[in-house]
Amino acid sequence: MEKQELSTLNHCVFSLQYHLVLVTKYRKQVISEPILKRLLEILRETLEKWDCRLIEGNGEADHVHLLFAGNPNLQLSVLANNLKTVSSRLIRKEFKKEISKTYWKPVFWHRSYFIMSCGGAPLSVIKKYIEDQGSKG
């Protein structure tokens, strides 16, 4: 079993991990290996600017998965949109010839995203633990 890493701020101890999925506009298959490699570099750097840490990242031709550790001060919707904006702008600039074959407008990501908290005990275990608080024996 993997030991859970705890982080601290002035008034709290926490362990927050998130799974984020970003999908290309119209699910077009535009993410080649070189684009994926560069995307992961951009996303890692952007996460670090938000005081987050990329644990794992990978993807396929039409989407990327990011597993990252965050902190309690994160506004997840703002972070997700910043990740999409920064990476879209840089990828479209650096891979203009390749991207323009698929997208004629300045787009790359779908406007939606998927994010889920993960790690720690299953919900059923936490629920049982809370239910049992205050009971003796």
Tell me the role of every PLM-derived stretch:
Residues M1-G137:
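Basic nucleic-acid-binding interfaces
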